[in-house]
Amino acid sequence: MQMHHFFIPEIGLLTIDTQSLPWSTKEHPMEIPMDESLELYQWMTHACPSPVPLLLGTSFQQKVWNALCKIPFGETISYQDLAIQIGQSKAFRAVAMAAAHNPFPLVIPCHRLIRSDGSIGGYSAGSGPELKEKLLLWEQRLAQELHLNSRSKQ
């Protein structure tokens, strides 16, 4: 069991105990209804506070996790570019390690990190890179659809 502590000003100190339970491996169809997609999109875009009020992790990990929260929904950034963004241009491997130790993979969207060559890279949650690829495809499709919908309303 792992204990995670974080502070939310409006609430106070929260402690979350997690057990090592297996992830569900059931396939979820990519074609989910738009209203359900929008609901998940809303949650994923507003779930990550900035700065992340975590009381765990090193200062470097927290810097990486905060930067991850600023990657827009449906977009990606390379490990190298994120390292440059946080002022640690040679620390791209350390960025990958910080992402791998992310305590809340969907809330802090480490799946939006990719390799400089455009390949997926690793992912510590669920089925690993396979899940990461599905999340990225879903986000990109939904972001594109939302963009098209907003253009058609203008």
Roles of regions detected by a PLM:
Residues 90-105:
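Regulatory, non-catalytic segments
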Residues 10-13, 104, 119:
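Short acidic/polar mixed-charge low-complexity motifs
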Residues 116-154:
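…primarily DNA-binding HTH/wHTH and HhH modules…
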Residues 68, 82, 110-111, 135:
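Residue-level signal for inorganic ion chemistry
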Residues 63-67, 94, 134:
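Pre-recognition alpha-helix immediately N-terminal to the DNA-recognition helix
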Residues 1-89, 142-154:
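Basic nucleic-acid-binding alpha-helical/helix-turn surface characteristic of O6-alkylguanine DNA
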